């Protein structure tokens, strides 16, 4: 038996935790008037097979079948996670419709509905601070820390996951491409 730990005192490594799923989208067969013009794989069978293949290797994704055989609910870690899957499938020749992203709510032990929260860190030039703060204020973000670094500010927020949906585009516009934004799951 081979191991990477000391043979006399083997210690178990802590498992890697996977962040909670925060967004879901409905993936369905394209039934628009332009269906069948852009993709090679257009049927629900093709879509189903590809999505089930994806969840075998993508451990941070969940798939649910719906009442309709043509639609599937795909849950993932966030916008980027789901958009990478969509773009990969598009490049592989799949043609599909995608629904609006929805935040996955959670019930605590008392039955109270809770919303996923994200810890957001932003590095932005000082002259764009006002526009960024205004945009985040409208999205219910709460400033927890601000640090000055040369001509940049680092701002840390706690924000509902729904507040981050399509925020990246606004952020890049507000900072003229000079801002850096990172977020991780913070809890419910």
Q: Model regions: which residues?
A:
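Accessory interaction regions appended to the cores of large information-processing enzymes
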Residues: 1-188
């Amino acid at each position: 038996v081979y191991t990477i730990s000391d043979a006399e005192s083997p210690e178990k490594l802590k498992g890697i935790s996977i962040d909670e799923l925060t967004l879901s989208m409905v993936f369905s067969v394209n039934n628009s008037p332009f269906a069948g013009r852009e993709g090679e794989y257009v049927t629900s069978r093709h879509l189903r097979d590809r999505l089930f293949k994806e969840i075998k290797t993508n451990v941070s994704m969940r798939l649910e079948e719906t009442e309709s055989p043509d639609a599937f609910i795909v849950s993932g870690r966030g916008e980027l996670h789901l958009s990478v899957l969509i773009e990969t499938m598009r490049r592989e020749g799949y043609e599909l419709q995608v629904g609006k992203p929805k935040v996955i709510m959670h019930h605590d032990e008392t039955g109270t509905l809770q919303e996923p929260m994200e810890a957001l860190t932003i590095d932005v030039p000082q002259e764009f601070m006002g526009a960024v703060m205004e945009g985040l204020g409208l999205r219910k973000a709460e400033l927890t820390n601000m640090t000055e670094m040369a001509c940049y500010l680092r701002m840390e927020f706690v924000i509902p996951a729904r507040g981050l949906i399509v925020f990246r585009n606004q952020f890049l516009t507000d900072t003229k491409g000079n801002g850096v934004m990172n977020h991780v799951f913070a809890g419910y």
